[in-house]
Amino acid sequence: MIPLSTKYVQRPELEYPFGLRWSPEEGEPFEVADGVHWLRMPLPIALDHINLWLLRDGDGWTVVDSGFGSDECREVWEHVFTTFLTPSQVKRVIVTHLHPDHIGLASWLALRCECPVLISKGEFEMYNNITIRDEAAFQLESQQFFTEMGYDTDVIAKFVHFMSNDKPVESRVQASMCEVIRDGGVM
């Protein structure tokens, strides 16, 4: 491979402060810095977990991302609510992007904790476009498009399912639950 630059910068080896491939147990927040807790949440796919973050926020907490919309993830949250913090201590839920493991339980958490969901304007608009579309028409158009592109039927079926709206999102995140963050906005 030809380097893009004649200058080569020696980079230090990665450091794993908690050990290589170590992660906390599901539902057991682990403090990684003052007021910053790492929360491991299960996923029912090959990548078997997502990392969520609990941030100390004055006398309460901010939750960053919510987990998959599944009974298993709700049970993990209920464990956190009985062992680490109470729902009333959650001041807000920040959704970083619209993947179902990040937004999946956002509406459930907002209702359970009586707090707003913060999401960027672009992500909220994209989420709305996905959740209000005609799903049957979208799947048919996607199937036709990928067939014309020459993809195998198995690949097409997997991709159309991946892009479909039957994701494990607990319930639709409503605009009334949200504080939409505009470009350059401050939380």
Question: Can you say where each PLM-predicted feature lies in the sequence?
Answer:
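Intrinsically disordered, low-complexity segments enriched in polar/charged residues with Gly/Pro
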Residues: 15-18, 32, 39-42, 167, ...
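N-terminal presequences and immediately downstream first alpha-helices
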Residues: 1-21
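Short solvent-exposed loop/turn micro-motifs enriched in small/polar/acidic residues
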Residues: 22-23, 46-48, 178-181
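Active-site HxH/HxHxD metal-binding segment of metal-dependent hydrolases
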Residues: 72, 78-186
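Conserved beta-strand hairpin/beta-sheet module of binuclear metal-dependent hydrolase folds
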Residues: 26-84, 88
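Short, compositionally biased leader-like segments
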Residues: 21-25, 156
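Core dinuclear metal-dependent hydrolase active-site scaffold
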Residues: 31-32, 54, 180-187
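A generic secondary-structure micro-motif detector
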Residues: 17, 67, 95-96
